[in-house]
Amino acid sequence: MPLNKRFTLTQYLIQERRRFPDARGDFNALILDVALACKAIARAVAFGELGGMLGNHDADAGGSINVQGETQKKLDVISNQYFTRMNEWGGHLAGMASEEMDDAYQIPAEHPRGKYLLVFDPLDGSSNIDVNVSVGSIFSILRAPQEAVESGRDVVEADFFQPGAEQVAAGYALYGPTTMLVLSVGNGVAGFTLDPMLGEFMLTHDKLQVPENTQEFAINASNSRFWEPPVKRYVDECLAGKTGPRDKDFNMRWIASMVAEAHRILMRGGVFLYPRDSKDAAKPGRLRLLYEANPIGFIMEQAGGRASTGREPMLGVQPTSLHQRIGLIFGSKNEVERIERYHAEPARAEMHNPLFAERSLFRS
């Protein structure tokens, strides 16, 4: 009988593996290595300024910018190191890719190579770390091409260019009031809470499901002037509340930490929109496909929700570059499908704004 009638992460993985009698232990061991990295990051986040963890990475006092053009925080760099060091040695991986690394990460020659690829955002929402807002780690596991596994060659970027539907597993860790690991191995979604006394992730939320309907949405409204008409229409209808076409009131949220947004939606429903927009022509989408949109999309779909670009299912998108950006909408199924319908409808000659249909602050 598991301790306190709860399964540990290890016990859960063993139980899942029993569904596949011919499976080896490589996959479970890889998940546990990822979990170990998340435990180390949780500890670093918890110490904060006491451990000298806050602020920008100095890179010998010159600062550092990642491949995204973003200033790296100390914890970005430290978290990336935890992920690479704790996953490179086990013999489970053919290679890795990260938000914080320009190129694919090769497994050092002194370590054996395996049949999986690991892609990750080591610290999502790190811009919030200095103000003590919840942050997290996101990861995705793919199968390496068989030819690469058999030859033992170095991985190349194209090896990672697999649609989200090809993911073997995906998950995230949330570093908040408690540390949680949320995981899907393709058989639903489970949540594990870190027991700080035992140092073990314990199964606390089994078979998580996203409610189909919701009255909450999350979007950065400061970008409204750059939104496409279908997104404007959807948000306007939500804001119109009971007096508008939706005939019910909505609440708007925005944390600026996608892991925190995803976790709230997973627990109580909602819809998250970081849509394609015209703010920067070079970046029509903001979130990274391989290590942000795909793993979160996989979790949402496994929990009965939906993930989309607005125009097509997120998990069907064919990646074309390692750090490819994309618009992302996910959450309660009926709301995401509504937004997809709005994108599919012919463009309106004039957008109807239910908030200002009768009177507007901007009328002459």
UniProtKB/Swiss-Prot annotation:
Cofactor: Mg(2+)
Pfam families the UniProt entry points to: FBPase (PF00316), FBPase_C (PF18913)
Binding site for substrate: 124-127, 220
NCBIfam families with a match to the protein in the record: PRK09293.1-1 (NF006778), PRK09293.1-3 (NF006779), PRK09293.1-4 (NF006780)
Superkingdom field: Bacteria
Catalytic activity: beta-D-fructose 1,6-bisphosphate + H2O = beta-D-fructose 6-phosphate + phosphate
Name of the protein described by the UniProt record: Fructose-1,6-bisphosphatase class 1 2
Protein's pathway: Carbohydrate biosynthesis; gluconeogenesis
Listed GO CC annotations: cytosol
